[in-house]
Design a protein with these regions (language model features):
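Conserved Rossmann-fold NAD(P)-dependent oxidoreductase catalytic core, especially the SDR/UDP-sugar
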Residues: 12-75, 80-81
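Short Gly/charged-rich anion-binding patches and loops
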Residues: 6, 39, 73, 163-164
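Strand-loop microenvironment adjacent to phosphate/nucleotide-handling motifs in alpha/beta enzyme folds
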Residues: 75-95, 100-266
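Conserved Rossmann-fold cofactor-binding substructure of NAD(P)-dependent oxidoreductases
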Residues: 1-9, 186
Length: 266
């Protein structure tokens, strides 16, 4: 398709995003979120794509989950393909209202079945955007974003998921219970937009901020390549080794409420 159509701009939004699924099957996160991104980057470079926008997530900031680290690696890979004549950048944002698997869709489905609504924790908060807001800001980010940068979109204040559930129950006029089931592996109480080493800088658009410009050393590029070579060896399937390699690649990745926490104690 790339050779035939020769696109000039690519918006890369394909990803696996189901948190518990990826904690259980980290190789799937690698195959889709990392290797899939790398395949698109190579195809884009081969046909001379001038602008590549990688759609990332707030879970990539100080990641504690397989999903988060896989998207953080994708950010770094995207930056590594940029040069002086192109703009390869990433855009982080949070939950998109109404998208497949979003909390609103899940809650409404639970209400339609008579409940209960299941929450992982009473104090969980998340950032939200509408689909139209997300599309408009991603397109604008592609227009103003600089090469090798990571951009953050203005999503307003984080929203209490408990409050969302309460409002939906109230509007349904049905006696629906709320059940607290506990945080899932890799889940945060609140999402962060920036790494601990980043600061939010203004851009030409008041709703788009610059988190950082990725500058990857030659040594880090060699490390990325060596990790990818190991993961691509025939028959490789060791989840613990995969996560260990990713922790070497992304040192800010610290597992939480997960079987992979043991690797952080080594």
């Amino acid at each position: 398709i790339f050779v035939e159509r020769k696109p000039e701009i690519v918006f890369h939004a394909a990803a696996l995003k189901h948190l518990p699924l990826l904690e259980g099957y980290p190789n799937e996160a690698y195959q889709t979120n990392i290797l899939g991104t790398l395949t698109l980057l190579k195809a884009s470079k081969n046909v001379g794509v001038s602008v590549f926008v990688n759609i990332s997530t707030d879970k990539a900031a100080n990641p504690i989950s397989v999903l988060g680290y896989s998207k953080r690696v994708a950010e770094r890979l995207t930056a590594s393909f940029g040069n002086s004549t192109t703009r390869y950048l990433s855009v982080r944002f949070g939950n998109v209202l109404g998208s497949r698997g979003s909390v609103l869709v899940s809650f409404r489905d639970q209400i339609s079945k008579g409940g209960p609504i299941t929450l992982t924790h009473r104090n969980v908060t998340r950032y939200f955007m509408t689909i139209s807001e997300a599309v408009q800001l991603v397109i604008q980010a592609g227009a103003v974003g600089k090469n090798q940068s990571v951009l953050v979109l203005d999503m307003g204040k984080p929203v209490s998921i408990f409050d969302v559930a309460t409002q939906l129950i109230r509007s349904s006029n049905r006696p629906i219970d709320i059940e607290i089931v506990g945080l899932r592996p890799g889940e945060k109480l609140y999402e962060e937009l920036l790494l601990n080493t980043e600061e939010m800088l203004p851009s030409h658009n008041p709703h788009i901020f610059i988190a950082q410009k990725e500058v990857l050393s030659p040594e880090h590029m060699l490390l990325i390549q060596s990790v990818l070579d190991r993961l691509n060896e025939p028959g490789f399937s060791d989840a613990m080794e995969l996560i260990g390699l990713m922790k070497a690649l992304i040192p800010e990745y610290k597992s939480n409420n997960s079987k992979f926490e043991v690797l952080d104690r080594v």
